[in-house]
Amino acid sequence: DATDKVVSILKFCKDPKFRKDIFELLGVTYQSKNFKAFIEPLLLHDYLELTVPDKPTSPKQQYRTTKKGLLFLETI
């Protein structure tokens, strides 16, 4: 279910993680459709943030749970 995936991602990204590691956690392929389905909405709602915000496509880019994301985890 979608909520379970969101919770899994936010817990997993308490420490910064690469996109490929997030996809591996979810058991999905490394494709832009999966980025748009799973990571992009969390970025747009400020639950995840970029570790290299000025270079979104950097090969060193990782994703980290924000304070807002951590607060969300506390409510469930």
Place the predicted regions along the sequence by residue.
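C-terminal regulatory or interaction extensions
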Residues: D1-I76
